[in-house]
Amino acid sequence: MTFSRRQFLHSATIAAAFPALPRIARAADYPARPVRIVIGFNAGGAPDVVVRLLAQWLSQKVGQNFIVENRPGAGGNIATEAVLRAPADGYTLLELGSPNFINATLSPDPNFDLIRDIVPVAGIGRNPFVMVVNPDFPAKTVPEFIAYAKSNPGKINMTSTGTGNLTHFSGELFKMMAGVDVVHVPGHGEMEAQTDLLADRAQVMFDPIVSTLGYVQAGKLRALGVTTATRIETLPDIPTIGQFVPGYEVDAQLGIGAPKGTPKDVVEYLNAQINAGLADPAIKQRLVGLGFVPMPVSQAQFGEHMTDEVEKWAKVVKFARVKLE
Protein backbone atom coordinates (compact mmCIF):
# COMPACT_ATOMS: atom_id res chain seq x y z
CA MET A 1 0.00 0.00 0.00
CA THR A 2 1.45 3.37 -1.01
CA PHE A 3 0.19 6.38 0.92
CA SER A 4 -0.63 9.52 -1.01
CA ARG A 5 -0.44 13.01 0.46
CA ARG A 6 -4.26 13.03 0.58
CA GLN A 7 -4.19 10.11 3.02
CA PHE A 8 -1.58 11.82 5.16
CA LEU A 9 -3.61 15.04 5.17
CA HIS A 10 -6.63 13.04 6.29
CA SER A 11 -4.53 11.58 9.09
CA ALA A 12 -3.36 15.08 9.98
CA THR A 13 -6.99 16.12 10.44
CA ILE A 14 -7.47 13.26 12.89
CA ALA A 15 -4.28 14.15 14.75
CA ALA A 16 -5.36 17.78 15.00
CA ALA A 17 -8.20 16.65 17.24
CA PHE A 18 -5.87 15.05 19.78
CA PRO A 19 -5.54 18.11 22.05
CA ALA A 20 -9.31 17.99 22.64
CA LEU A 21 -9.20 14.32 23.67
CA PRO A 22 -8.67 13.01 27.22
CA ARG A 23 -5.11 12.46 28.38
CA ILE A 24 -3.35 9.78 26.32
CA ALA A 25 -3.35 6.46 28.18
CA ARG A 26 0.09 5.72 29.62
CA ALA A 27 1.60 2.29 28.91
CA ALA A 28 1.96 0.85 32.44
CA ASP A 29 4.73 2.91 34.09
CA TYR A 30 6.38 3.83 30.80
CA PRO A 31 8.49 5.88 30.56
CA ALA A 32 10.04 5.61 34.01
CA ARG A 33 13.46 6.86 32.88
CA PRO A 34 14.98 8.79 29.94
CA VAL A 35 14.36 7.51 26.40
CA ARG A 36 17.13 7.50 23.81
CA ILE A 37 16.49 8.25 20.11
CA VAL A 38 19.41 7.16 17.94
CA ILE A 39 20.00 8.99 14.63
CA GLY A 40 22.23 7.51 11.93
CA PHE A 41 23.58 10.84 10.69
CA ASN A 42 25.58 13.82 11.91
CA ALA A 43 24.01 16.56 13.99
CA GLY A 44 22.78 19.72 12.28
CA GLY A 45 20.95 18.37 9.23
CA ALA A 46 17.21 18.82 8.78
CA PRO A 47 16.29 15.30 9.99
CA ASP A 48 18.41 15.81 13.12
CA VAL A 49 16.78 19.18 13.81
CA VAL A 50 13.28 17.73 13.34
CA VAL A 51 13.90 14.78 15.68
CA ARG A 52 15.43 17.05 18.34
CA LEU A 53 12.42 19.36 18.08
CA LEU A 54 10.05 16.44 18.63
CA ALA A 55 12.22 15.02 21.42
CA GLN A 56 12.05 18.34 23.25
CA TRP A 57 8.26 18.42 22.91
CA LEU A 58 7.96 14.83 24.17
CA SER A 59 10.23 15.56 27.13
CA GLN A 60 8.00 18.42 28.20
CA LYS A 61 4.70 16.57 27.70
CA VAL A 62 5.66 13.13 29.00
CA GLY A 63 7.79 14.20 31.95
CA GLN A 64 10.86 12.15 31.02
CA ASN A 65 13.81 13.24 28.91
CA PHE A 66 13.95 12.07 25.29
CA ILE A 67 17.66 12.22 24.45
CA VAL A 68 18.93 12.32 20.86
CA GLU A 69 22.14 10.43 20.13
CA ASN A 70 23.95 10.67 16.78
CA ARG A 71 25.60 7.46 15.55
CA PRO A 72 26.57 8.28 11.95
CA GLY A 73 28.05 5.88 9.45
CA ALA A 74 27.22 3.20 6.88
CA GLY A 75 24.10 5.01 5.69
CA GLY A 76 22.34 4.54 9.01
CA ASN A 77 23.34 0.90 9.54
CA ILE A 78 25.59 1.68 12.54
CA ALA A 79 22.71 3.39 14.32
CA THR A 80 20.36 0.51 13.52
CA GLU A 81 22.81 -2.04 14.93
CA ALA A 82 23.19 0.04 18.09
CA VAL A 83 19.43 0.10 18.59
CA LEU A 84 19.09 -3.63 17.98
CA ARG A 85 21.72 -4.35 20.64
CA ALA A 86 19.59 -2.51 23.20
CA PRO A 87 16.74 -4.16 25.14
CA ALA A 88 13.39 -4.09 23.36
CA ASP A 89 11.74 -2.11 26.14
CA GLY A 90 10.92 1.24 24.50
CA TYR A 91 13.87 3.09 25.98
CA THR A 92 15.97 2.98 22.80
CA LEU A 93 14.33 4.19 19.58
CA LEU A 94 15.61 4.61 16.02
CA GLU A 95 15.15 7.53 13.66
CA LEU A 96 14.01 5.96 10.39
CA GLY A 97 14.11 7.53 6.96
CA SER A 98 14.57 7.05 3.25
CA PRO A 99 18.30 6.19 3.62
CA ASN A 100 17.32 3.17 5.74
CA PHE A 101 14.76 2.06 3.16
CA ILE A 102 17.27 2.41 0.31
CA ASN A 103 20.14 0.78 2.21
CA ALA A 104 18.05 -2.29 2.93
CA THR A 105 18.97 -3.28 -0.64
CA LEU A 106 21.86 -1.00 -1.61
CA SER A 107 24.06 -1.69 1.41
CA PRO A 108 22.44 -4.49 3.40
CA ASP A 109 23.87 -5.27 6.82
CA PRO A 110 24.26 -9.03 7.42
CA ASN A 111 23.44 -8.51 11.08
CA PHE A 112 19.85 -7.39 10.61
CA ASP A 113 16.86 -7.17 8.30
CA LEU A 114 15.14 -3.79 8.57
CA ILE A 115 11.58 -5.02 8.05
CA ARG A 116 12.02 -8.13 10.20
CA ASP A 117 13.94 -6.59 13.10
CA ILE A 118 12.61 -3.03 13.43
CA VAL A 119 9.09 -2.32 14.67
CA PRO A 120 7.51 0.76 13.07
CA VAL A 121 6.40 3.24 15.72
CA ALA A 122 5.29 6.47 14.03
CA GLY A 123 5.75 8.73 11.05
CA ILE A 124 7.10 12.24 11.55
CA GLY A 125 7.28 14.03 8.22
CA ARG A 126 7.79 13.96 4.48
CA ASN A 127 10.15 16.26 2.58
CA PRO A 128 8.87 16.84 -1.00
CA PHE A 129 11.27 16.94 -3.96
CA VAL A 130 11.10 18.82 -7.26
CA MET A 131 12.52 18.08 -10.71
CA VAL A 132 14.49 21.14 -11.83
CA VAL A 133 16.44 21.93 -15.00
CA ASN A 134 18.86 24.62 -16.10
CA PRO A 135 16.75 27.51 -17.49
CA ASP A 136 18.50 27.17 -20.88
CA PHE A 137 17.36 23.57 -21.24
CA PRO A 138 14.88 23.32 -24.15
CA ALA A 139 12.18 21.38 -22.27
CA LYS A 140 9.66 23.40 -20.29
CA THR A 141 7.44 20.52 -19.17
CA VAL A 142 7.88 16.92 -18.06
CA PRO A 143 6.48 15.55 -21.37
CA GLU A 144 8.87 17.80 -23.32
CA PHE A 145 11.76 16.57 -21.17
CA ILE A 146 10.84 12.94 -21.82
CA ALA A 147 10.52 13.56 -25.56
CA TYR A 148 13.87 15.38 -25.68
CA ALA A 149 15.60 12.67 -23.63
CA LYS A 150 14.26 9.93 -25.91
CA SER A 151 15.48 11.85 -28.97
CA ASN A 152 18.89 12.45 -27.35
CA PRO A 153 19.73 9.30 -25.37
CA GLY A 154 22.76 9.60 -23.12
CA LYS A 155 23.18 13.32 -23.80
CA ILE A 156 21.52 14.72 -20.67
CA ASN A 157 23.50 14.86 -17.43
CA MET A 158 21.62 14.39 -14.16
CA THR A 159 23.37 15.61 -11.03
CA SER A 160 22.74 14.65 -7.41
CA THR A 161 24.26 15.26 -4.01
CA GLY A 162 25.95 11.85 -4.15
CA THR A 163 25.64 8.29 -5.40
CA GLY A 164 23.11 6.11 -3.65
CA ASN A 165 21.06 8.77 -1.88
CA LEU A 166 17.53 9.98 -2.52
CA THR A 167 18.52 12.82 -4.88
CA HIS A 168 20.18 10.14 -7.02
CA PHE A 169 17.52 7.45 -6.81
CA SER A 170 14.63 9.87 -7.38
CA GLY A 171 16.17 10.41 -10.80
CA GLU A 172 16.81 6.72 -11.34
CA LEU A 173 13.16 5.98 -10.55
CA PHE A 174 12.17 8.61 -13.11
CA LYS A 175 14.51 7.05 -15.70
CA MET A 176 13.08 3.61 -15.01
CA MET A 177 9.43 4.66 -15.17
CA ALA A 178 9.73 7.16 -18.05
CA GLY A 179 12.02 4.94 -20.12
CA VAL A 180 14.73 7.55 -20.72
CA ASP A 181 18.53 7.32 -20.89
CA VAL A 182 19.99 10.08 -18.72
CA VAL A 183 23.58 10.01 -17.41
CA HIS A 184 24.11 10.31 -13.66
CA VAL A 185 26.98 12.67 -12.83
CA PRO A 186 27.03 12.92 -9.02
CA GLY A 187 28.15 15.99 -7.15
CA HIS A 188 29.74 16.01 -3.72
CA GLY A 189 27.02 17.57 -1.64
CA GLU A 190 24.23 20.06 -2.26
CA MET A 191 26.40 23.06 -3.12
CA GLU A 192 28.44 21.30 -5.80
CA ALA A 193 25.38 19.68 -7.37
CA GLN A 194 23.51 22.98 -7.58
CA THR A 195 26.62 24.73 -8.95
CA ASP A 196 26.91 22.13 -11.71
CA LEU A 197 23.25 22.62 -12.56
CA LEU A 198 23.48 26.41 -12.59
CA ALA A 199 26.62 26.25 -14.77
CA ASP A 200 24.93 23.82 -17.20
CA ARG A 201 27.48 21.07 -16.55
CA ALA A 202 24.38 19.11 -15.59
CA GLN A 203 20.92 19.72 -16.98
CA VAL A 204 18.53 18.13 -14.47
CA MET A 205 18.30 17.36 -10.76
CA PHE A 206 15.75 15.95 -8.33
CA ASP A 207 16.18 17.91 -5.12
CA PRO A 208 14.25 18.81 -1.95
CA ILE A 209 11.99 21.80 -2.58
CA VAL A 210 13.36 23.56 0.49
CA SER A 211 16.87 23.47 -1.07
CA THR A 212 15.79 24.63 -4.52
CA LEU A 213 12.86 26.99 -4.01
CA GLY A 214 14.95 30.18 -3.93
CA TYR A 215 16.61 29.37 -7.27
CA VAL A 216 13.25 28.56 -8.85
CA GLN A 217 11.64 31.75 -7.58
CA ALA A 218 14.63 33.78 -8.84
CA GLY A 219 14.39 32.20 -12.30
CA LYS A 220 17.83 30.59 -12.01
CA LEU A 221 16.32 27.11 -12.25
CA ARG A 222 13.12 25.91 -13.90
CA ALA A 223 10.81 23.53 -12.04
CA LEU A 224 9.18 20.92 -14.28
CA GLY A 225 7.33 18.81 -11.74
CA VAL A 226 7.02 17.96 -8.07
CA THR A 227 7.66 14.39 -6.98
CA THR A 228 4.68 14.09 -4.64
CA ALA A 229 1.24 12.64 -5.43
CA THR A 230 -0.43 16.06 -5.29
CA ARG A 231 0.71 19.62 -5.92
CA ILE A 232 2.69 21.48 -3.28
CA GLU A 233 1.58 24.67 -1.56
CA THR A 234 4.92 26.41 -2.13
CA LEU A 235 4.84 25.65 -5.89
CA PRO A 236 1.11 25.57 -6.65
CA ASP A 237 1.51 26.07 -10.41
CA ILE A 238 3.94 23.18 -10.86
CA PRO A 239 2.27 19.87 -11.80
CA THR A 240 3.14 16.51 -10.32
CA ILE A 241 5.49 14.25 -12.25
CA GLY A 242 2.97 11.47 -11.65
CA GLN A 243 0.50 13.34 -13.87
CA PHE A 244 2.72 12.39 -16.82
CA VAL A 245 4.51 9.32 -15.42
CA PRO A 246 1.70 7.41 -13.67
CA GLY A 247 2.69 6.00 -10.31
CA TYR A 248 5.78 8.15 -9.85
CA GLU A 249 5.97 9.44 -6.27
CA VAL A 250 8.97 10.33 -4.10
CA ASP A 251 9.67 12.30 -0.98
CA ALA A 252 12.16 12.00 1.86
CA GLN A 253 10.63 10.15 4.78
CA LEU A 254 11.22 10.54 8.50
CA GLY A 255 9.83 8.38 11.28
CA ILE A 256 10.58 6.41 14.43
CA GLY A 257 11.18 2.68 14.93
CA ALA A 258 12.04 0.37 17.82
CA PRO A 259 13.65 -3.06 18.24
CA LYS A 260 11.46 -6.06 17.47
CA GLY A 261 9.77 -7.26 20.64
CA THR A 262 9.07 -3.79 22.05
CA PRO A 263 5.77 -4.09 23.99
CA LYS A 264 2.75 -3.23 21.89
CA ASP A 265 1.28 -0.88 24.49
CA VAL A 266 4.55 1.09 24.56
CA VAL A 267 4.57 1.37 20.76
CA GLU A 268 0.94 2.53 20.74
CA TYR A 269 1.64 5.06 23.49
CA LEU A 270 4.62 6.49 21.59
CA ASN A 271 2.60 6.62 18.38
CA ALA A 272 -0.18 8.58 20.09
CA GLN A 273 2.25 10.99 21.75
CA ILE A 274 4.20 11.64 18.54
CA ASN A 275 0.99 12.23 16.59
CA ALA A 276 -0.15 14.65 19.28
CA GLY A 277 3.16 16.47 18.91
CA LEU A 278 2.71 16.70 15.15
CA ALA A 279 -0.71 18.28 15.74
CA ASP A 280 0.81 21.03 17.89
CA PRO A 281 0.69 24.25 15.81
CA ALA A 282 4.18 25.30 16.91
CA ILE A 283 5.68 21.94 15.87
CA LYS A 284 3.78 21.96 12.58
CA GLN A 285 5.06 25.46 11.81
CA ARG A 286 8.67 24.48 12.51
CA LEU A 287 8.38 21.33 10.38
CA VAL A 288 6.96 23.27 7.44
CA GLY A 289 9.76 25.79 7.79
CA LEU A 290 12.27 22.95 7.48
CA GLY A 291 10.54 21.68 4.34
CA PHE A 292 8.58 18.83 5.90
CA VAL A 293 4.90 17.94 5.63
CA PRO A 294 3.79 16.44 9.00
CA MET A 295 3.04 12.71 8.71
CA PRO A 296 0.71 11.59 11.52
CA VAL A 297 -0.27 7.99 10.83
CA SER A 298 -1.06 4.87 12.82
CA GLN A 299 1.64 2.38 13.70
CA ALA A 300 0.18 -0.09 11.18
CA GLN A 301 0.09 2.50 8.40
CA PHE A 302 3.71 3.45 8.98
CA GLY A 303 4.64 -0.24 8.89
CA GLU A 304 2.92 -0.71 5.53
CA HIS A 305 4.64 2.41 4.28
CA MET A 306 8.07 1.11 5.37
CA THR A 307 7.51 -2.14 3.49
CA ASP A 308 6.35 -0.31 0.36
CA GLU A 309 9.39 1.99 0.41
CA VAL A 310 11.87 -0.87 0.84
CA GLU A 311 10.26 -2.76 -2.06
CA LYS A 312 10.21 0.33 -4.29
CA TRP A 313 13.86 1.20 -3.76
CA ALA A 314 14.92 -2.43 -4.17
CA LYS A 315 13.60 -2.28 -7.74
CA VAL A 316 15.41 1.02 -8.38
CA VAL A 317 18.73 -0.25 -6.98
CA LYS A 318 18.48 -3.26 -9.30
CA PHE A 319 17.62 -1.03 -12.27
CA ALA A 320 20.46 1.43 -11.58
CA ARG A 321 23.02 -1.35 -10.98
CA VAL A 322 24.65 0.71 -8.27
CA LYS A 323 27.16 -0.92 -5.95
CA LEU A 324 28.81 1.03 -3.16
CA GLU A 325 32.51 0.43 -2.59
Language-model regions: role of each:
Residues 26-115, 155-157, 180-203, 296, ...:
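N-terminal (or domain-start) structured segment
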Residues 32-34, 176-177, 217, 240, ...:
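An extracytoplasmic/periplasmic, membrane-proximal ligand-sensing/linker region
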Residues 1-10, 15-29:
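N-terminal twin-arginine translocation
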Residues 4, 75, 141, 188-190, ...:
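Short loop/turn segments at beta->alpha junctions
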Residues 85-90, 105-192, 241, 246, ...:
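Hinge/capping helix and adjacent helix->loop/strand transition within the periplasmic-binding protein
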Residues 100-109, 175-177, 204-236:
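A ligand-binding cleft/hinge motif common to bilobed small-molecule-binding domains
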